[in-house]
From Swiss-Prot:
Locus of motif 'KMSKS' region: 238-242
GO cellular component: cytoplasm
Record-stated family: Belongs to the class-I aminoacyl-tRNA synthetase family. Glutamate--tRNA ligase type 1 subfamily.
Protein name: Glutamate--tRNA ligase 1
Location in or out of the cell: Cytoplasm
Organism: Ehrlichia ruminantium (strain Gardel)
UniProt record, GO biological process: glutamyl-tRNA aminoacylation
Source organism phylogeny: Bacteria, Pseudomonadati, Pseudomonadota, Alphaproteobacteria, Rickettsiales
Function: Catalyzes the attachment of glutamate to tRNA(Glu) in a two-step reaction: glutamate is first activated by ATP to form Glu-AMP and then transferred to the acceptor end of tRNA(Glu).
């Protein structure tokens, strides 16, 4: 059997890091098993769901290097949901209810006041037909009837054996009074129709899983394998879309590389060390979902920021060739020169300026004679990365300066700043004419 997983975001906002982590782990899991990956948009909430959000979610996943085998919108499947809904209604596994929101809130408060679990009392099942006729169709909503005699259990790939006493579960609302579906039933129908074999999601869905297992059973369908990830926390607050959290847009504002994000989320919540990679495919090797633990997982944006320069340093010219071409950089020499000294990709623009002809050298008065001497012993012939070694040897024959007192004045003269990448790599980029111009700057002052 081919493994099939799905990532099912609701297009009512941007992806936050909790979503991204779930999507990544789900993607890595199925790709590690040569499985298929479904992107499902849970857009049954037609008022809040927006095409702009749907497009942004798809673009964000692509930016993170995640692909999918096919996608589906729940909003295109209402006829199918109606078909299954009517079947379950006929089987008396779904039943109509008539309470207002205010009545339900009152019942809940009274149950809590009496120390009872806030479970729906199934009063709608006790109504006579005459009593039902008093309500208009607009007042009717529907619940799925839980078999409360069962102990619902499953073997969770992260949490081990999980059990729920169905007597403590309230019959879930599956259809609202306005005719729209809640999350529960359409999700199960889709999982059945698209042959979903494994479901990876947050631990906040555990009680939903217990309910949905009964729905799978009611529809005589195979129950998928479940993995419930611990939730992400930032400063002891759960990260979610509604209460706020880092979105991919926030991460892009920080100019974080996709693989800094992926490398981080692939390992936090496990005991494995975080190792940076430049391609998402590298994270598939040896992926093991059982390594994720049950403890709350702390998210720290500073940790991702620290990974960013490490990812950039490991990137080859081919990894960034397209982005460099947008800056009119076609040679690998500049990237090889600066990649180990940038915190974010845009930092390269400063080095483009430094390597350009507009840079003003910095030559201290006390170093002017030294720079003139250094220029006089600059090697002839082709300039390559060995030129620096020869040049320094020539300089040391003419001065008793220590290495530090040689390197810093030369760096200031050649770049205008006191720190940066290896000068050996800079010389071929500048070329002889520009080197002579910069070193000869003091004589023109």
């Amino acid at each position: 059997m081919i493994m099939m997983t799905r990532f099912a975001p609701s297009p009512t906002g941007y992806l936050h890091v909790g979503n991204v982590r779930t999507a990544l782990i789900c993607w890595l899991y199925t790709r590690s098993k040569q499985g298929r990956f479904l992107l499902r948009f849970d857009d049954t909430d037609l008022q809040r769901s927006k095409d702009d959000y749907r497009n942004e979610i798809a673009n964000d996943l692509k930016w993170l290097q995640m692909d999918w085998d096919f996608d589906v919108r729940q909003s295109s499947r209402f006829d199918r949901y109606d078909e299954i809904f009517n079947y379950l209604l006929k089987e008396e596994l779904i039943y109509p209810c008539y309470e207002s929101k205010e009545e339900l809130d009152f019942k809940r408060k009274m149950q809590l006041k009496l120390g009872l679990p806030p479970i729906y009392d199934r009063s709608a099942l006790k109504l006579t037909q005459d009593e039902k006729n008093k309500y208009s169709e607009q007042d009717v909503y529907f619940r799925f009837k839980i078999d409360q005699s069962q102990l619902i259990s499953w073997d969770d790939e992260i949490r081990g054996k999980v059990s729920f006493n169905a007597a403590n579960i309230s019959d879930p609302i599956v259809k609202r009074a306005d005719g729209t579906y809640t999350y529960m039933l359409p999700s199960v129908i889709d999982d059945i129709d698209f042959d979903i074999t494994h479901i990876v999601r947050g631990e906040d869905h555990i009680s939903n899983t217990a309910i949905q297992i009964q729905m799978f059973n009611a529809l005589r369908a195979s129950v998928p394998t479940f993995s419930h990830l611990s939730l992400l926390y930032c400063d002891d607050n759960k990260i979610s879309k509604r209460v706020g959290g880092f979105s991919i847009k926030d991460m892009q504002f920080y100019e974080l590389e996709p693989m800094a994000i992926n490398s981080y989320f692939a390992k936090i919540g496990t005991s494995d060390p975080i190792v940076v990679h430049t391609k998402i495919q590298d994270l598939i090797y040896n992926f093991d979902i059982t390594k994720f633990n049950q403890a709350p997982t702390q998210f720290n944006i500073d940790d991702v920021i620290k990974l960013n320069p490490k990812v950039l340093h490991k990137m080859s010219f081919s990894d960034v060739k397209h982005r460099l071409s947008e800056l009119n950089i076609t040679s690998p020499d500049l990237w090889d020169f600066v990649s180990g000294n940038v915190q974010k990709f845009s930092d390269i623009q400063e080095w483009i300026k430094i390597c350009g002809q507009s840079t003003v050298p910095v030559i201290n008065e006390s170093d002017q004679d030294f720079i003139k001497m250094a220029l006089s012993v600059f090697p002839n012939g082709e300039i390559n990365q060995d030129t620096w070694k020869t040049w320094v040897a020539n300089i040391k024959e003419k001065t008793d300066r220590k290495s530090k007192d040689i390197f810093i004045p030369l760096r200031l003269a050649l770049t205008g700043i006191s720190t940066g990448p290896e000068l050996a790599k800079l010389l071929p980029i500048l070329g002889r004419a520009e080197i002579i111009r910069r070193l000869g700057y003091s004589s023109r002052c």
